[in-house]
A protein has these predicted regions:
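A short beta-strand-turn-helix
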Residues: 43-69
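Thiol-based oxidoreductase modules, predominantly thioredoxin-like and allied folds used
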Residues: 74, 93, 98-112
Length: 157
């Protein structure tokens, strides 16, 4: 039994010594850091003729300036009226390519952004933001369908 205790003590001391050495080695290592230029996040959402799915709520938080006319379409996959509006938004994104940015905002994932704009509790809700700070909101599809109604609203900005 005494042999076992001596062996256990020797193993414990040996492992402590190795731990200290590796700790010293870690401190001696240098790390090379590479600087990478990253495009501004706003460049992710350009008026390129597509509807972008929001992946960063901070980009369009209340009070944030937008570089061009921007449509935030607050919707959910389970919402029938939202599914009626989606093809119209996609067509308008193509029609207004280069002029208007279209963003689809899933309220199940970004409910706090929806609430931050005080748009009520119904969807679909569309918020139009202009670079000069003006905004307009529409709840439901009555003012936005057919497509020509929605286009007239965009043209009024």
């Amino acid at each position: 039994m005494k042999k076992f205790i001596y062996i256990l003590a020797a193993v414990a001391l040996a492992s402590c010594g190795n731990k200290q050495e590796s700790s010293n080695n870690e401190q001696a290592e240098t790390v090379e850091v590479e600087t990478v230029e990253v495009a501004p996040a706003a460049d992710l959402y350009l008026p390129d003729g597509t509807v972008h799915n929001l992946d960063n709520a901070n980009l369009y938080a209340p009070g944030v300036a937008v570089p061009n006319l921007t449509v935030l379409d607050f919707n959910a996959v389970w919402c029938g009226p939202c599914r009626q509006l989606t093809p119209v938004v996609e067509e308008l994104a193509k029609d207004y390519e280069g002029r208007v940015t279209f963003i689809s905002v899933d309220v199940d994932n970004y409910g706090e952004l929806f609430e931050a704009y005080n748009l009520g509790s119904s969807i679909p809700a569309v918020l139009i933001l202009s670079p000069d700070g003006n905004k307009a909101s529409y709840v439901g599809t009555g003012d936005l369908l057919p497509k020509e109604k929605f286009a007239a609203i965009l043209d009024s900005f």
